[in-house]
Amino acid sequence: MDNFKKYLSTAPVLLTVWLSITASGIMIINRLYPDPLIFPI
């Protein structure tokens, strides 16, 4: 279990998780507001 925690804390794994979360958020925003040029601010 200790080796698994060390594996999860490595940079490529953290980068993959972070990029997946960011991409999911962008896809959700893009689905709700498909045209960012007319984004209601």
From Swiss-Prot:
Q: What is its main location?
A: plastid
Output a single Gene Ontology CC term carried by this record: chloroplast thylakoid membrane
One of the GO biological process terms = photosynthesis
Q: Keywords for this entry?
A: Chloroplast, Membrane, Photosynthesis, Photosystem I, Plastid, Thylakoid, Transmembrane, Transmembrane helix
**Pfam family membership, one:** PSI_PsaJ
Localization, per the record, is: Plastid, Chloroplast thylakoid membrane
Membrane spanning residue stretches = 7-29
Q: How does it sit in the membrane?
A: Single-pass membrane protein
Query: Any idea what job this protein has?
Result: May help in the organization of the PsaE and PsaF subunits.
Protein family = Belongs to the PsaJ family.
What name does this protein carry?
Answer: Photosystem I reaction center subunit IX
Originating species: Heterosigma akashiwo (strain NIES-293 / 8280G21-1)
Q: Which gene encodes it?
A: psaJ
